[in-house]
């Protein structure tokens, strides 16, 4: 396990603990989804997060301007703390670790289904129900079609 992954897990765990204590778990999860959607869409945001040249005060100003009115106080304080500790470049890893912890806490299991043809609603429901019964978790499904498959389904 890479060092940055362990560090990201520690930050995610601390944020998870605080969100559970504050009763803001759903809001923090929503905040991460919003933040990561912007990061995925913006090369400029990735450059800001990864830049060692941008000073702390400037970075905090950018984070407040971009996210301030869209995320909770806890998340904004967390982002500022990451900038202060110069850990903002691992934000995507922290978000991924947090999402794993969130899914575990909520008993969600993400499952990807790939089939040779589009599955009808009955087949989709049967697959989801079968996996939910076997795992005891709520399935978060994604479905895709791969013409290269000769038949069947990969999970």
Describe these PLM feature segments:
Residues 1-154:
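Elongated, mostly alpha-helical coiled-coil "stalk/stator" tethers of large membrane protein machines
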């Amino acid at each position: 396990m890479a060092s940055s992954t362990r560090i990201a897990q520690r930050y995610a765990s601390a944020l998870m603990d605080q969100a559970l204590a504050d009763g803001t778990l759903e809001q923090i999860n929503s905040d991460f989804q919003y933040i990561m959607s912007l990061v995925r869409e913006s090369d400029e945001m990735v450059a800001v997060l990864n830049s060692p040249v941008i000073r702390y005060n400037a970075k905090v100003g950018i984070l407040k301007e971009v996210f301030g009115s869209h995320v909770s106080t806890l998340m904004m304080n967390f982002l500022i703390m990451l900038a202060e500790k110069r850990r903002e470049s691992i934000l995507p890893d922290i978000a991924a670790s947090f999402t794993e912890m969130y899914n575990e806490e909520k008993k969600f299991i993400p499952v990807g289904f790939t089939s040779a043809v589009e599955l009808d609603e009955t087949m989709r429901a049967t697959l989801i129900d079968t996996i939910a019964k076997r795992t005891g978790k709520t399935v978060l499904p994604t479905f895709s079609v791969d013409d290269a498959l000769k038949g069947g389904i990969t999970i």
